Amino acid sequence: MSGKMKTMDGNAAAAWISYAFTEVAAIYPITPSTPMAENVDEWAAQGKKNLFGQPVRLMEMQSEAGAAGAVHGALQAGALTTTYTASQGLLLMIPNMYKIAGELLPGVFHVSARALATNSLNIFGDHQDVMAVRQTGCAMLAENNVQQVMDLSAVAHLAAIKGRIPFVNFFDGFRTSHEIQKIEVLEYEQLATLLDRPALDSFRRNALHPDHPVIRGTAQNPDIYFQEREAGNRFYQALPDIVESYMTQISALTGREYHLFNYTGAADAERVIIAMGSVCDTVQEVVDTLNAAGEKVGLLSVHLFRPFSLAHFFAQLPKTVQRIAVLDRTKEPGAQAEPLCLDVKNAFYHHDDAPLIVGGRYALGGKDVLPNDIAAVFDNLNKPLPMDGFTLGIVDDVTFTSLPPAQQTLAVSHDGITACKFWGMGSDGTVGANKSAIKIIGDKTPLYAQAYFSYDSKKSGGITVSHLRFGDRPINSPYLIHRADFISCSQQSYVERYDLLDGLKPGGTFLLNCSWSDAELEQHLPVGFKRYLARENIHFYTLNAVDIARELGLGGRFNMLMQAAFFKLAAIIDPQTAADYLKQAVEKSYGSKGAAVIEMNQRAIELGMASLHQVTIPAHWATLDEPAAQASAMMPDFIRDILQPMNRQCGDQLPVSAFVGMEDGTFPSGTAAWEKRGIALEVPVWQPEGCTQCNQCAFICPHAAIRPALLNGEEHDAAPVGLLSKPAQGAKEYHYHLAISPLDCSGCGNCVDICPARGKALKMQSLDSQRQMAPVWDYALALTPKSNPFRKTTVKGSQFETPLLEFSGACAGCGETPYARLITQLFGDRMLIANATGCSSIWGASAPSIPYTTNHRGHGPAWANSLFEDNAEFGLGMMLGGQAVRQQIADDMTAALALPVSDELSDAMRQWLAKQDEGEGTRERADRLSERLAAEKEGVPLLEQLWQNRDYFVRRSQWIFGGDGWAYDIGFGGLDHVLASGEDVNILVFDTEVYSNTGGQSSKSTPVAAIAKFAAQGKRTRKKDLGMMAMSYGNVYVAQVAMGADKDQTLRAIAEAEAWPGPSLVIAYAACINHGLKAGMRCSQREAKRAVEAGYWHLWRYHPQREAEGKTPFMLDSEEPEESFRDFLLGEVRYASLHKTTPHLADALFSRTEEDARARFAQYRRLAGEE
């Protein structure tokens, strides 16, 4: 290793280089590119200097379109400008990319390349986004791994300045952007020597200046437009040599050889793969292995994709090549081939001795590519007629594009590399601990290190698998670990759900966090699990990290215990030295959370090493027989064939045929109910003797895992053991039971916290103690549907309505889901939902687990997601589409009244026409009308037509859901337009005051003083008052609510909003894990109450109907604040951490925040006529 070595991921490497060359960064958060901008923002806040002696000026915009516009403007003003983006965000920049390229401006777009949303959304890596901008005129430079991101990102900036062409500098999303590697860092002093100062001076002089003004962006006619476009050709013709020159200089600095196209392999290769991105490292491993066995193969790795230089291409490709396979990580439906393949075929167009060239697609949406997949490509090239247009790594049994597996398993050498896998659960700290571990190994030892983290889409409580490799040589294996030396599991429930030991080498080590004794292990471990441990001579250890963490006061955060145990077992470095390093990491990671938290975690490190228990594996485990398979319960095909394999982490094995009939992205509702994840450590247990039957616990439950049930006498007598009940208050004919699903509960504890009963009618107990209650839950859900004996617009009555949102993947204690669940209880059987991309779309529709469900009649919310930026328009379009069909129905029904129909049908049609826009009673009217049409339609075309459209008889309740990032920022223009349209749509904004889905970035909803990403020193601008802006139209129903503060007001506002025959907007305060509640998310509802009592959040409603009635339309539902505003702020880490680091600044900003809140409250009082 020469030079300074540091452990970092691809995003950090790109940020490090770009910071040096950047004066202005205009950004907008989007996964997986956001950490690049976050790094830049953090360094700028710390005063870090770029090459020009200044901190970077970073500006978060309202959208990627806005970011691209700001990039364009800053470049025209003469500042070196950069942005960071991916996927749909990059596509929003396309119009400005054309402009920036056409105006020869040296901007750089760093892209962590990601899949595009087509029939579904996918946040993982491929090249669909970058291939969609190859026509813009921007140069395109690709990197294969983290080290190349460090080295070649500099080339993008340097060549942009010298060549006057903007660059798209890209690398694979997640696989490179989030992979942690130990790499050599280029120092700014080195980069400064490469900068072409005269070219930079020329750029500055060419900027827009009033001292020597010019005009740019003229409107041109056909006479000159074409010629001026062609005049720019010479810049593109010169660019490849400029890039090659800078690559030569970088190579001289680093000792790593770079060219526009890098060839590696046999000098006389006959078969060559051409590719770009992280797959090249996998291909390289295969090439080395095959050549060592005497074959003649090679790899041509593409770096400069645009402009595509034929001279440099042929200079690198061996003359001996006879067959070429081109790998594209994108899909262009209808094209003859994918882009890189077309370029390669075109390169040989005039060559009489051209090799045979085939192309294939691989790794769309982050699919893993293994060495055996690449071996299959080389096998394909050996065939007399190689398959063209193939797919890699899947089984296509529909259109038969997939390559068959390699003829024999390829044994790629990983000698000297130790591979470790860590199974964890989102929010249990496993990923964070492993990031600390890999940095300790990388930065504190001579070893090379690599880490990659795979996740599912659940917000927390989902599965995570950390893949760590370390060894005495560079590690370039960009795929998941399938042969491990060490495996750890932090969740004991996983032993029954996943094949944890798959790939663990003979003699390897397995560490399990569990509370089981050795005797209990015999009972709980599956037979196949025990057999593998015994037959493969596995070293098996357990650690009761849960109980130790609880005793230490760490709750469910036992990550440090497990990490310390890993260091002791792995023996990579001296355990005591490792413990010291871990303790230092704790101080750095948890410094903002106070001395007590630091001390608890440091003590956990000590106990993690001291409390390990080695299990003596009984000899008889090796000869255990698999028990007879039990007959599975009847289940839908989708559950058996798709959901269950995916939930076992076997989705990669599903063939294309599994999705025939789902090609448009349609998934069935209600699939989350089949998961039964059992992720809670503790779950609530009903104590009927103290229960007041208020149903508040069900009202606020984020996962709909608590539900009141009414049993008639027969059902009560037939109830299973364990079903407790008491006489129902207000419904004497029934027994009341509070059903709790232990396997669907996330264990947040909000139900216990808000229970008003003296002594609490709910108590938390361990999940294991309540598993036997699952049949009781099933029985309660299967009870006969009953008419609600209470008004459903009351807190108590609403909870006797079936929730049509259940068991989502939202965080424990989520502040968003209770609102959505409540709305489904009120209107769910006739709802259409347009959902903006964000947290609510991820917990709302992460395949295959869909929490939106149906009632006993099969009715429920129909849900769809378009994009982040267009959700309001999308929802309006839904409403207009349904409205158009219903207008046709109304016309046909009016005509049908002239037909000789029965009085019953005539009356049903008249009633429908008179009340078609009324929600109350719409289902009953629709049912009656459908019934009469079915009886009389035969032989009457008009009635037949009406009956065919019967699904539209029910008045639909159109809802538009989204977070504050959508409503306040990227989607605000569309939201404003929809509100101004006057159309009858209902909008619900989950206001978490940050971009929750991308990790807590600042939005225009973020108040002054809050620390958020892109507001590292506290936000300085006032929170936008979205409600007041909407209210200015006069005909929009607007409400601000906080369920935890006033459940009745929340319910009233939602009911009024839906009933208002025009646009309505409900802004709902939602506590979020990003707020860092010191009381924990078990108090998220209480936090909303504190926010209102302190005057931080205000409750109000604006009803246009009241003005028509001569009343004040604005109703202030909040009382005068009585609690301490400052104490409320200090109860959340997002505010308290600023006070810890810079108390004087925090005090000043806290005062501003409180003044803003008081000013808003005073204004609300005036509007309500209280002053």
Swiss-Prot record:
InterPro entries xrefs: 4Fe4S_Fe-S-bd, 4Fe4S_Fe_S_CS, PFOR_II, Pyruvate:ferred/Flavod_OxRd, Pyrv-flavodox_OxR_EKR_sf, Pyrv-flavodox_OxRtase_EKR, Pyrv/ketoisovalerate_OxRed_cat, Pyrv_Fd/Flavodoxin_OxRdtase_N
EC number: 1.2.7.-
GO terms (BP aspect): electron transport chain; nitrogen fixation; response to oxidative stress; small molecule metabolic process
Known cofactor(s): [4Fe-4S] cluster
GO molecular function, one term: pyruvate-flavodoxin oxidoreductase activity
UniProt key word Metal-binding: yes
Residues the entry annotates as binding [4Fe-4S] cluster 3: C811, C814, C839, C1072
Record text on cofactor binding: Binds 3 [4Fe-4S] clusters per subunit.
Keywords assigned: 4Fe-4S, Electron transport, Iron, Iron-sulfur, Metal-binding, Nitrogen fixation, Oxidoreductase, Repeat, Transport
Domain 4Fe-4S ferredoxin-type: 682-711, 736-767
Catalysis performed (reactions): oxidized [flavodoxin] + pyruvate + CoA + 2 H(+) = reduced [flavodoxin] + acetyl-CoA + CO2
Binding site for [4Fe-4S] cluster 1: C691, C694, C697, C755
Binding sites annotated in the UniProt record for [4Fe-4S] cluster 2: C701, C745, C748, C751
Record function comment: Oxidoreductase required for the transfer of electrons from pyruvate to flavodoxin, which reduces nitrogenase.
Family: Belongs to the pyruvate:ferredoxin/flavodoxin oxidoreductase family.
Protein name, entry field: Pyruvate-flavodoxin oxidoreductase
Upper taxonomic lineage: Bacteria, Pseudomonadati, Pseudomonadota, Gammaproteobacteria, Enterobacterales
